[in-house]
Every structure is written in C-alpha cells, then in structure tokens.
Amino acid sequence: MDLSGAPVPVALLRGHTHPVTSLRFYNAFLVSGDESGWVFWWSLVTRRPLAIWKAHHEAILSLVWMDETHLLTQGRDDKLYVWRLELDAQGKSGLSVKPPSSLVADDPTDYPKPWLTYSLTVNSLNFCQVAWVNGLLAKPDLDSSDKVELLEWTDGAFRVVWNDIYPRLNGIKTGIVMDLNIMNKKLIVGYEGGAVAVFDISDRNRYTPVLNYYVVSHVQPVLSVRAHPTKKEFVSSSADSLIVKHPIKDQVVPEEEMEEPEPAKNSERPPSPKIVEVEDSPELEPPKNVVRGFDVPGLELEEGIEVKEEEKPESKPLDAVNVRHSGLSSLQLDSDGDLIMTAGWDGKVRLFTYDDISKVSVFHEREGVGCVAFSTPTTSDTANPRLAKALTTRWIAVGGKDGKIELYTIQQGNEKTLGEGRSKYIRH
C-alpha cells in the first residue's frame, strides 16, 4: 500500500445506526458494539450478522469473548453482562438478524436477547474498558474511580480477589483509571494523570498486589495500555502524541506503610456524570516534546517536575516516540507483536512497527474512527474452504463513527509484506 493513497477494504459491514465503540474478534466471528448499546454478532465467513440485540441502555465500552459460547459486555449504564451465544446445526442463532433502522434504533422490543447468564453492577464513570484473561477480570473499583478491582470467574460468577489496588506512593495523585490490561499475572494500569503502573497479581496470599513499576510518561491522560504477547514489555498511548514502550519487571517499588484495606463493599451505582461534548479539532498542534519522570533523547523534562528516582527504582521506559499526532486511542498489538495500531482523534488509523515504533501505514474513515481491532488467526483442518480462510486470515477491523465497519487483511509472509515501498502491510 502506498502512503499517498487509501487502501480498499475487503468488506464493509453495515448495520449500526450509531458510532461503533467496540470491536472484538474470536475465531471466525466478530462482535461489535455501538454508542446506543446495540451489539452485532458477525460471521466472517458470510460477513453477515448472526444475531443483533440491544445489550445496554448506553454505549458499549467492552466486548470480551470469555470462551467460545460466552460473551461479556460492559456498558456506560454501569452494567456488565455475560451472554450465552449458540448456533444450531444450520448455523442459526434463533435471534434477529435484521439491522435496526435509525427510526427504531432505541426501541428494541422486536429484538430478543440471548440467554443472560450473569449480571454485575460496575463503575463506568471513567469510560474505562475492563480487562480479561484466563478467568481474571480487572475493572475500576466500584467506590473509587482511581483504584482497580480484580475479580475471578468461578462457578459461573465473579468473586473479588482484590478491591483496593492503587500505587501507594507518597504524595502522588494518579487521577482516575483510564485503561487496563492483564498479561502473565501482571496488571497494567493507565491513569488520567499520565502515569502507568504495573502490579504483580500472582500471590493471592497478599492483601494487596506488589507494585513493580510506576512512571509518569505522558503529559495528557493515558488512553491505552497493551502488553506485548511474548516480550516482557508493554506500550502506552495517550491524548498527547507519544507512544511509549515500557518494561515489565519483577522488581518491587517501595511503597509507604500500608494498612490492610477493608473488605469489598456492595454500594449503589455511582451517579451518572454530566457529559460535555468537546469539538474535535484535527488541526491541533502536537504538544511539546515533554515526558515526565524519565529522560529520552530529544525530549525535554517538563518544568517544575522533580524526579525522585529513589522512589521509583528502574522506573524508566524503554523508548518514547513522538508521532506528531495528538489523541491516540484504542491502541492494539497484533497477535505476533509485530505491529501497533491506533485510532486517532483526527479520524486516521495508523500502523507502526513494534520494534522501533516507525510508521508504516496511515488510512482513515471518512466520518472518523472510533475503535480498531486485530484478529488472532488460528490453524484449521476444516473441509470448508470459506471457514478455513476466515479462521486463518489476519483481519483488521475499523469501527467508524458513521456506524460502518471496514475489514482489511494483512498478508502473512516471511516479513508480513506485500508490494513495494515502506507500507506493505495492508492488502489492497
């Protein structure tokens, strides 16, 4: 793909009447959620819906495949649901597959829902997505938006493991939790104040997880944190123009004296916040090349910030790159960890190499982009060639603010390349 031109999607999925806010692949399926609370379950074989239902009263924040038949959804309505999704012998779900029109999008009475197996009240004040891996769920604490709660899925229900997770460091204010990720018994947290933290969640006998890493690496709120699938590293992006690569270590950051937290409390749903619309301005100049808490060649330390390295041993990122575009959200890594993808506030999707965070591709949605997702290809011994292709293809999904979902494919080779030039990752 030439950077001077736009790639052509291999498929365009139409159906949502509101901006797409969440996407998640699983095997030959894709699920998508929108700003009005609707969920679409798509087949990548037919590229048509298998089921459509109104899952939440407000925007979908998270979609998580817990296993091949259970889908977790989180909404801005402070609810988390677990649905059972099944197909019959003919590949039918028994649910509606007719997309709602814009005139009836808020009247879901004609759309039966899948079997709801579990419901939980959560704190969605932050717009923070939940994180899930191998039966563990991380989410913002129900009572304090600057803390994290860790739960475990056991016998068809979530049980609290820890409910008061935050960096216990003297004199710091992290702001609210913005994004979460779990990888290899490590909990990664991004904060409103620009900090990121890593906690060790392997020892259940402790009354709080060990803090392994803490650094303020952004001058704006952190929007995304994602762990590398094989390396002990993670990357973060924020409302500023930096993509920062961090280490994941087993060190212990000294914390102030801690008292054992109180047991988890079952409180009422937090009050709904007042939502203020902010006009998007793609012409914004990128912020100053400023990173707090560490030294990076070519970047200046923000005035007035005193770095106390003795409080944060080895809390220094591996790399930081100013990509000159503010507002990098929905950051994703492909299954091999070779590529980084972001959805920009300027409506552009950007692909970077992981190793040196160099830009390899830029393309955009006409009406703006809300979220992006990579698939994880699997091997297949099926006799159905269409199903085999859907399972083994490396998909990219781009959710637009116009309600459309664009599907692209990455051609897999020795170097994941196609064609000539710097940008060879997207099939035309």
Swiss-Prot record:
Pfam families, alphabetized: WD40
Domain of life: Eukaryota
Keywords: Chromatin regulator, Nucleus, Repeat, WD repeat
InterPro entries registered for this protein in UniProt: WD40/YVTN_repeat-like_dom_sf, WD40_repeat_dom_sf, WD40_rpt
Single GO biological process annotation from the record: chromatin organization
Localization, UniProt: Nucleus
Main location: nucleus
Described purpose of this protein according to its UniProt entry: Component of the ASTRA complex involved in chromatin remodeling.
Keyword Nucleus: yes
Assembly and binders: Component of the ASTRA chromatin remodeling machinery complex.
Similarity section: Belongs to the WD repeat ASA1 family.
Protein name, per record: ASTRA-associated protein 1
PANTHER family reported in the protein's UniProt record: GUANINE NUCLEOTIDE-BINDING PROTEIN SUBUNIT BETA-LIKE PROTEIN 1, TRANSDUCIN BETA-LIKE 3
GO cellular component, one term: nucleus
Region (Disordered) residue spans: 250-295
Start-end of each WD repeat: 15-52, 55-93, 122-163, 171-209, 217-259, 323-362, 364-418
Organism of origin: Yarrowia lipolytica (strain CLIB 122 / E 150)
